[in-house]
């Protein structure tokens, strides 16, 4: 019996023998296609080839493409674990013809691979095929050449409500390449329910589609007209997991060798015994998508691809919790995954350390809120009477406890409860509105300015140009002229001003002509034109007028130093921390640089020092900063780094600094690394799970920062009557002395508290024979209150003590209950009741509990509530 790895390799070997180029699986993050969330089909990496926008040195290709369908239009997440064949991650085996062979060869290749004893050797009588209703050519090839009986060939027409909307007609979009397809089905036998495709029972599991062969032979125009393509092509896809299930004689994808091994390992780690539990299937599926997404550069976050990854991880963690996992388990599956994926696991293996760290950190982070969130959800579900969970509750779980909506839906599904998603969406929209209102300032020109044409950029070599005004915008509207005092956007035919992009801020400066000055505060791109945003301080400007465009050269120079330093920093991070480091965001201004990057754990002081030292070494090396224009494939062949998800043109600008750094970049840079002068890191911290941020300064700004630090050190040394060299020792002495005094003071407070205890015993009131002390004591910290409560419990023998203290505008609450009363009076219950009055929360043991609060004005009310509650319950 063939393993899944052997089937994958045999497919590639077969098509290689038929003259196909074996092409590596592309990344799960689509390159040059920001419209696509994840790679979800084998043809994604060849999309531009099919559209005629890209040429390859081969006309036949074959791949084993990794795919993810979670989030976006293609989303299988909610079905994973509940069906035999849904996955977030799967491999698509495919063969492609770019104007080479067509229907006859495509069909014969598929049949030979499936049925030949040399390859898969499937019984011919087990295979059924479908064709598009009017595709007589494909029908005849199947029937007359291949020999499939007419009763096992099914014509499928337009079954989706409009012309050419059919299971057997494929289209790339509303317009563009399209064509009929033929699908091959495997019959598992009459012991399994289901009917052939096109029948009322087609949704059963007896007849399973294993291969789809698409014939791209038309170009659909906007009016619906179908034109024949001059060079028709072929795009095919066969799910590796499905064909493995057929060849391994199982009816569920989760019973093939890869999943059996992952399920067994998961059960071993979490201590599960029922290997058919759906939670094991969920986890086995999710480790594949999560590991490969991280290996391809996706980091868990709260937006975009990162949020889909976070949703999948959290769903897996929740199912581990259902199985009884008591500690982090998910990351422990990575070594087994690498093993079962064989050759296809090499990309995860190359980044194994980073994959495991990120999975562990994300799981640990979610574990902190999982229990509390599930408790809230359980309570809410117990009160559901109409089978619908409130959207407000679902949003609170999302907003406060980090529960993605599909995770909450997963829990609800197990209890046959649905979610009011409209209410959830309203809450989400309200939050977005609040966030937008909080962040809005000035005019959002991007939302109102639409300009055709293209601005010629001259800023790589010039800081001053003569230019003609092609458009003016005032208050977001196109105008013919502007007057002094008006803020506006000026569009020029050509410009030396750099428009904000790639993290680099837009240039500032001014536009001038005789008697006219327009102060440019920022430069932004609107499509292909550059907008100069600012204020006309004197004179008037009109469309068609010529002006001198003059960039603030000093600001531009400082910005260029920071941009070049950012490239050196990126290279240094990868050299010292590892190749898992990739850019996740940047801001390059004239004053400083900020760089966000993938890094699963904190950076040590020693590593930070190494990074800074390495960057400064490369600055002193005084490398020339070289720029070259080349096609993107040549750039990547040279090792140039490109950002995931960025769309690049046919030609790209490659920036090289010696043998240390090579990146794609369109920004402004220093001429030599030595121009940077000095690089100094000023902060380093985490900004999200798995993402760190470094802020740094360069050149004169770095020198100024160091001078300021020296000034602070000198002033501090003077205050402590020390010198800079012995300052740390002097501070340590002061800290030791302070700790000693604080300890002595605490002892005095505790002694005073115990001495005051006898006075409280005398003032205790009796409620149904039980001694109760409920008092406000200001200026006493929690630790002293606890000592006092313990002492009073001993003195009373039997009783309840509730103290509230205001210290530094915060409320401290402590409740003590003697052991003989804890059966009916719980300290935690009482302290929480008091905490609600002062805007806080707390907890503890039945005999001792503490809480804090932020509303000292309500302390008297908290004491009264405690007294009333005790009157009622004692």
Swiss-Prot record:
Localization: Cytoplasm
Keyword Zinc: yes
EC number assigned by the record: 6.1.1.7
Pfam families: DHHA1, tRNA-synt_2c, tRNA_SAD
InterPro entries on file: aa-tRNA-synth_II/BPL/LPL, Ala-tRNA-lgiase_IIc, Ala-tRNA-ligase_IIc_anticod-bd, Ala-tRNA-synth_IIc_core, Ala-tRNA-synth_IIc_N, Ala-tRNA_ligase, Ala_tRNA_ligase_euk/bac, DHHA1_dom
Cofactor binding note of this UniProt entry: Binds 1 zinc ion per subunit.
SUPFAM superfamilies linked: Class II aaRS and biotin synthetases, Putative anticodon-binding domain of alanyl-tRNA synthetase (AlaRS), ThrRS/AlaRS common domain, Translation proteins
SMART domains, alphabetized: tRNA_SAD (SM00863)
Keywords: Aminoacyl-tRNA synthetase, ATP-binding, Cytoplasm, Ligase, Metal-binding, Nucleotide-binding, Protein biosynthesis, RNA-binding, tRNA-binding, Zinc
Family according to the record: Belongs to the class-II aminoacyl-tRNA synthetase family.
Protein name (database record): Alanine--tRNA ligase
């Amino acid at each position: 019996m063939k393993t899944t790895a052997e089937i994958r390799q045999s497919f590639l070997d077969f098509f290689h023998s038929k003259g196909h180029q074996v092409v590596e699986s592309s990344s799960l993050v689509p390159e040059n296609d920001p419209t696509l969330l994840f790679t979800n089909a084998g043809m994604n990496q060849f999309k531009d080839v099919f559209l005629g926008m890209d040429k390859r040195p081969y006309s036949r290709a074959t791949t084993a493409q990794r795919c993810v369908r979670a989030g976006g239009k293609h989303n299988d997440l909610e079905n994973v674990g509940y069906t035999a064949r849904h996955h977030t991650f799967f491999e698509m085996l495919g063969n492609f013809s770019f104007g080479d062979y067509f229907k006859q060869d495509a069909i014969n290749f598929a049949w030979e691979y499936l049925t030949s004893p040399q390859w898969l050797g499937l019984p011919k009588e087990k295979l059924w095929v479908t064709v598009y209703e009017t595709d007589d050519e494909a029908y005849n090839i199947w029937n007359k050449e291949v020999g499939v009986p007419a009763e096992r060939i099914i014509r499928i027409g337009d079954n989706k409500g409009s012309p050419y909307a059919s299971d057997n007609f494929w289209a790339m979009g509303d317009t563009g390449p399209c064509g009929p397809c033929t699908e091959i089905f495997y019959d598992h036998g009459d012991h399994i329910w289901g009917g052939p495709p096109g029948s009322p029972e087609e949704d059963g599991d007896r007849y399973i589609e294993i291969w789809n062969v698409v014939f791209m032979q038309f170009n659909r125009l906007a009016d619906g007209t179908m034109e024949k393509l001059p060079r028709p092509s072929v795009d095919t896809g066969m799910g590796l997991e499905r064909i493995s299930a057929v060849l391994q004689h199982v009816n569920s994808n989760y019973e093939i060798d890869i999943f059996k091994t992952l399920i067994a390992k998961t059960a071993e780690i979490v201590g599960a015994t029922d290997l058919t539990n759906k939670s094991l299937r969920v986890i086995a599926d999710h480790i594949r998508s999560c590991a490969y997404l991280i290996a391809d550069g996706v980091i868990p976050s709260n937006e975009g691809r990162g949020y889909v990854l976070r949703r999948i991880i959290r769903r897996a963690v929740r199912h581990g919790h259902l199985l009884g996992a008591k500690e982090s388990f998910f990351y422990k599956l990575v070594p087994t995954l690498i093993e079962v994926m064989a050759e296809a696991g090499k990309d995860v293996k190359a980044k194994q350390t980073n994959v495991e760290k990120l999975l562990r950190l994300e799981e640990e982070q979610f574990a902190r809120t999982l229990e509390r969130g599930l408790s809230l959800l359980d309570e809410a579900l117990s009160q559901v009477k109409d089978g619908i969970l409130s959207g407000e509750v679902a949003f609170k779980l999302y907003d406060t406890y980090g529960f993605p909506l599909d995770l909450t839906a997963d829990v609800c599904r197990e209890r046959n409860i649905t979610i009011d998603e409209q209410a959830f969406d309203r809450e989400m929209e309200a939050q977005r509105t609040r966030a937008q209102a909080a962040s809005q300032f000035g005019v959002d020109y991007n939302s109102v300015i639409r300009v055709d044409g293209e601005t010629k950029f001259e800023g790589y070599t010039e800081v001053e140009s003569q230019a003609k005004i092609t458009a003016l915008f005032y208050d977001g509207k196109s105008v013919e002229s502007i007057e002094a005092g008006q803020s506006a956007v000026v569009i020029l035919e050509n410009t030396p001003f750099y428009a904000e992009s790639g993290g680099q801020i837009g240039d500032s400066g001014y536009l001038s002509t005789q008697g006219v000055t327009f102060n440019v505060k920022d430069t932004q791109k609107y499509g292909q034109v550059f907008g100069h945003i600012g204020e006309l301080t004197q004179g008037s400007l009109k469309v068609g007028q010529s002006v001198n465009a003059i960039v603030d050269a000093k600001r531009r120079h400082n910005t260029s130093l920071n941009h070049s330093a950012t490239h050196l920093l990126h290279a240094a991070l990868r050299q010292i921390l590892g190749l898992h480091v990739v850019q996740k965001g940047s801001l390059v201004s004239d004053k400083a640089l900020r760089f966000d990057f993938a890094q699963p754990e904190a950076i040590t002081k020693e590593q930070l020092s190494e990074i800074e030292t390495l960057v400064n070494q490369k600055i002193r090396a005084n490398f020339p900063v070289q720029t070259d224009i080349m096609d993107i494939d040549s750039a990547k062949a040279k090792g140039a780094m490109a950002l995931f998800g960025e769309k690049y043109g046919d030609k790209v600008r490659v920036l090289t600094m010696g043998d240390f750094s090579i990146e794609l970049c369109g920004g402004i840079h220093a001429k030599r690394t030595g121009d940077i002068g000095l690089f100094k890191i000023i902060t380093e911290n985490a900004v999200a799970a798995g993402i760190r941020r470094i802020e740094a300064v360069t050149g004169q700004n770095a020198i100024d920062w160091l001078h300021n630090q020296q000034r602070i050190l000198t002033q501090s040394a003077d205050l402590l009557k020390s010198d800079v060299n012995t300052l740390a020792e002097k501070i340590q002495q002061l800290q030791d002395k302070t700790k000693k005094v604080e300890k002595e003071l605490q002892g005095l407070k505790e002694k005073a508290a115990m001495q005051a205890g006898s006075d409280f015993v005398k003032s205790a009131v009796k409620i149904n024979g039980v001694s109760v002390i409920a008092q406000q004591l200001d200026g006493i910290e929690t630790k002293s209150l606890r000592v006092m409560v313990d002492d009073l419990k001993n003195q009373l023998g039997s009783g309840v003590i509730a103290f509230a203290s205001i210290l530094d505008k915060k409320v401290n609450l402590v409740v003590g209950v003697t052991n003989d009363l804890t059966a009916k009076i719980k300290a935690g219950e009482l302290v929480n009741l008091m905490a609600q009055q002062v805007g806080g929360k707390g907890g503890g043991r039945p005999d001792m509990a503490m809480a804090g609060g932020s509303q000292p004005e309500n302390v008297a009310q908290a004491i009264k509530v405690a007294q009333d509650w005790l009157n009622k319950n004692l």
